UniProtKB/Swiss-Prot annotation:
GO terms for cellular component: small ribosomal subunit. This is Small ribosomal subunit protein uS4. It comes from Photobacterium profundum (strain SS9). Belongs to the universal ribosomal protein uS4 family. InterPro entries: Ribosomal_uS4, Ribosomal_uS4_bac-type, Ribosomal_uS4_CS, Ribosomal_uS4_N, S4_RNA-bd, S4_RNA-bd_sf. One of the primary rRNA binding proteins, it binds directly to 16S rRNA where it nucleates assembly of the body of the 30S subunit. With S5 and S12 plays an important role in translational accuracy. The keyword Ribosomal protein applies. Gene3D superfamilies: Ribosomal Protein S4 Delta 41, Chain A, domain 1 (1.10.1050.10), RNA-binding S4 domain (3.10.290.10).
Amino acid sequence: MARYLGPKLKLSRREGTDLFLKSGVRAIDTKCKIDNAPGQHGARRGRLSDYGVQLREKQKVRRTYGVLEKQFRNYYKEAARLKGNTGENLLQLLEGRLDNVVYRMGFGSTRAESRQLVSHKAILVNGTVVNVPSFKVAANDVVSIREKAKNQARIKAALEVATQRELPTWVEVDNSKLEGTFKRLPERSDLSADINEHLIVELYSK
């Protein structure tokens, strides 16, 4: 499945919630009818079956983290093999992706922009260039901006945006050095209550 390149707001309207794909902090403009699905008959959202509800939740999480369908299924399989709660394991695996960590640290204003920074070799992990967005960041890994990329306007703009949102407790950032430490994997209580990972587990357990 190819990566979606169309309007970002359309995805948020499809899921009925702001996925923060367009901006890292600014809520969707009030003119955007977030409660209406895209399309001519978007105002008439049909009642979903149990399967439909589960599918929409999976799509919401997958699109939030910018992961393709095959990747997402592989993350679920890995989460199911790990000890503990499968749903929580899944969210932790997604949070540990390098592109997501770059976003959480405020070096990219969106996950998509953060993914691009990684792909363009602007990111170091423990002093080594890593250009794989799905790279699994471990506790105490140091993530930083490569020296020749530090003056990029988009990074400066992202840092400005980041000052308007609360820094997650599981990362520590030194903006003067443009580097941060991934202290630990987040606990479930650290993450959005708008995500119902149990629905995703039910979907894949069928």
